[in-house]
């Protein structure tokens, strides 16, 4: 059920205070802290380039990580803040929060579509237009779905698929409190042109 959680490597940071943090930055690291989960806070260093690459991929604050620190047990964490240099806008500090398996968190979950060959609308030349390739859901940290599935069986041209049309995994709840659109099946351009011509003739 749960998707593969990406690893994030870190090292224990020896020393505390601004001096230790400055030393870490000089050595190519970004200082950070791991807190929560009923344990003592842990000072860490993460490689600057690793963090920067993760940030560039986007949705860093919505991604669950498996934090690996030498000498420590692996722990699931989510980033709760990235401090940046006010001039260069580059990361200078990062905060991670430990999560229990029962913790509730918001994550973007990928949407997959199945049974394309069972959709009459697609067989007639219609196009599946995906409005939301990912959906933000509130989920339990110990049971994160890899994806949610949209069954296209029986879908016709003009059909619109809303979030309430999808069977969500147990315990997963959309963070947006409205029946938003996931996808639709639009008519092929030739059919749309034909319809427009008929409407013009009737007018």
From Swiss-Prot:
One of its GO terms (biological process) is translation. GO terms for cellular component: cytosolic large ribosomal subunit. CDD domains: Ribosomal_L25_TL5_CTC. Keywords: Ribonucleoprotein, Ribosomal protein, RNA-binding, rRNA-binding. GO terms for molecular function: 5S rRNA binding; structural constituent of ribosome. Belongs to the bacterial ribosomal protein bL25 family. CTC subfamily. This is one of the proteins that binds to the 5S RNA in the ribosome where it forms part of the central protuberance. HAMAP family: Ribosomal_bL25_CTC (MF_01334). Part of the 50S ribosomal subunit; part of the 5S rRNA/L5/L18/L25 subcomplex. Contacts the 5S rRNA. Binds to the 5S rRNA independently of L5 and L18. This is Large ribosomal subunit protein bL25. The lineage of its organism: Bacteria, Pseudomonadati, Pseudomonadota, Alphaproteobacteria, Rhodobacterales. The gene is rplY.
